[in-house]
Amino acid sequence: MKSNRQARHILGLDYRISNQRKVVTEGDTSSVVNNPTGRKRRADSQK
């Protein structure tokens, strides 16, 4: 993975934060989009 570290950083997939957030680049503006994973433990999500 060390050899692919720079490419992942360009794609906004830095290995430290790739699970939590994603960087979306459109034109010259970049925005960080939260990408929640795992169990959603909110009480209102129970059915």
From Swiss-Prot:
Query: Sorted alphabetically, which InterPro entries does this protein's record hold?
Result: SRA-like (IPR012607)
Coiled-coil segments, which residues? none
Region annotated Disordered, chain positions? 23-47
GO BP, one annotated term: translation
> Which family does the UniProt entry place this protein in?
Belongs to the SRA family.
Biased composition of type Polar residues is found at: 23-37
Lineage, top-rank taxon, reads Bacteria
* Physiological role: Although this protein associates with the 30S subunit of the ribosome it is not considered to be a bona fide ribosomal protein.
| Annotated organism of origin | Salmonella typhimurium (strain LT2 / SGSC1412 / ATCC 700720)
**Protein name, per record:** Stationary-phase-induced ribosome-associated protein
List cystine links.
none
User: Assembly state and interactors?
Assistant: Associates exclusively with the 30S subunit; there is 0.1 copy per ribosome in the exponential phase and 0.4 copies per ribosome in the stationary phase.
What ranges does the record list as Basic residues composition bias?
38-47
Q: What gene makes this protein?
A: sra
